[in-house]
Amino acid sequence: MLFIGLKKRVKIGKFPIEIEQEQAISPAYSQGIEQLIKRDLHPQAWKEKPFNPIQDFLGQSLPVKTQFYAKIGWTFNNRNDAAIIVSPDNKAHYILVVFGDEKKFYQDKEFFPILSRQVYNQMLKK
């Protein structure tokens, strides 16, 4: 069962690509959005906040010096995360978009961080 429509999924998936390619309206606008969604992965920057885009999402399991830009979505019946991820050594630079519409995925707080770390490790092997 799809809780997020296909058009919305495509828009969420295109969002980080348009930012990376500076095509989100204009280069200046894209750079502005990138700064708005830039996330500090050091735990002291997010750990004590009641709502943050790191804990239980794609950034939680990544090294703290990773460049991380993310836009999350979370409702009562789904979670999604769209992120631009750059390793500290710049060997890995990729976009990861994950939708968790099934109950077992959107209720599992470990799924997104585990998946993210596995993708990160694989990207570093290239």
Residue ranges and their predicted role:
Residues M1-K126:
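Penicillin-recognizing serine hydrolase domain
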